[in-house]
Amino acid sequence: MIVVTGSVTARQDTFDQARKLSLEHVHRSRGEPGCISHAVHVDCENPLRLVFFEQWADRAALLNHFAVPASREFVKSLQSLAAAASSIELYDATRLEKL
């Protein structure tokens, strides 16, 4: 399984638009093949920061997600609303156990 974490901090005047775009992206992405989960959250310590958490079946599914035109457009649109550069990290993960 591939785990993706990411974040972006919006400007005060663009936060509502950034949140709306992010929710649209998350809902669309959940329907893609290989998407196990895809979520966006507001950071409790910085209410202008959106935090993404995604789980993908494998790297191929994630690369297909990145290739979707709507995903590429989302990244461009979100970056235009950001106060600073976004971050994204990929992890190769194995579930050890569900508690």
Regions from the language model: what does each represent?
Residues 2, 40-48, 74-99:
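Glycine-rich beta-strand-turn "strand-cap" elements at beta-sheet edges
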Residues 2-36, 40:
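N-terminal first-folded block
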Residues 2-9, 39-66:
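Short, well-ordered beta-strand segments in beta-rich or mixed alpha/beta enzyme
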Residues 16-18, 50, 62, 98:
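Short acidic, gly/pro-rich beta-turn/loop elements at beta-sheet edges
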Residues 20, 24-36, 55-89:
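An amphipathic, aromatic/His-enriched active-site/gating alpha helix that lines ligand/cofactor pockets
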